[in-house]
Curated annotation (Swiss-Prot):
One of its GO terms (cellular component) is plasma membrane. Its main location: membrane. InterPro entries: UCP020606. It is found in: Cell inner membrane. It comes from Escherichia coli (strain K12). It comes from the Bacteria. Residues 1-7, 53-55, 153-177 are periplasmic. This is Inner membrane protein YjdF. Residues 29-31, 77-131, 199-209 are cytoplasmic. The keyword Transmembrane helix applies. It is a multi-pass membrane protein. Keywords: Cell inner membrane, Cell membrane, Membrane, Transmembrane, Transmembrane helix. The chain crosses the membrane at residues 8-28, 32-52, 56-76, 132-152, 178-198.
Length: 209
């Protein structure tokens, strides 16, 4: 199958993420929280490198995964409630809490939605744009809900030590707002990125028509 990215670009991106991973791990505020946050990055990067030849993704998807990985690693480094740039945004917008975790949850909807869309469209598993859009949003919300369950399990297992991982910042509606941000990310995919995504799929011969 035709590669969508040159091996040099893909390998350089993986190396960049590895270096960021090492740096954030060394300087992490809490090593256990960092490990829990970056584990998905480690798994996904290995998976993408292993499948780059037989199942290459669109450059758009690779780019968004790259950005999402950085967001996760920075969140793991400081813990989401203490990311410095989040405090700057909080002050600038006059918010009551650090909003960096909401950026993470937005991408948690955006990226899985695009992954789901790419798989569904390329595999021709579903006919009809509206049904594809609906299923893409369902997948993103399901992943978001699973992540919230993982946070709950972590809270039960770790007790007070899970506060940095949960990052609720005293917000009783944190779970609901997290999932809403994920939904916004998924809607961004189906409303604003779908056409460009389809053009890339056609350009690289990943779909026909």
């Amino acid at each position: 199958m035709t590669r969508t990215l040159k091996p040099l670009i893909l390998n350089t991106s993986a190396l960049t993420l590895t270096l960021i991973l090492i740096y954030t791990g060394i300087s992490a505020h809490d090593k256990l929280t960092w490990l829990m946050e970056v584990t998905p990055v480690i798994i996904v990067v290995q998976l993408l490198l292993a499948t780059a030849r037989r199942y290459p993704l669109t450059p758009l998807l690779y780019t968004l995964i790259f950005l999402h990985a950085i967001i996760l690693m920075v969140g793991g480094q400081y813990t989401y409630a203490k990311v410095p740039v989040g405090f700057e945004v909080q002050e600038w917008l006059g918010l009551s809490r650090n909003p960096y975790d909401k950026l993470g949850h937005f991408f948690q909807g955006l990226v899985p939605a695009l992954v789901a869309r790419e798989i569904l469209v390329r595999g021709m598993y579903v006919r009809g744009r509206k049904m594809v859009a609906f299923l893409v949003c369902c997948v993103a919300l399901a992943i978001s809900a699973m992540y919230e369950l993982i946070e709950w399990w972590a809270a039960l297992a770790m007790g007070q030590g899970a506060d940095d991982f949960l990052g609720t910042q005293g917000d009783q509606w944190d779970t609901q707002s997290d999932m809403f941000c994920a939904l916004l990310g998924a809607l961004t995919t189906v409303i604003f990125l779908a056409r460009f995504h389809c053009r890339q799929l056609r350009r690289f011969g990943l779909i026909t028509g």
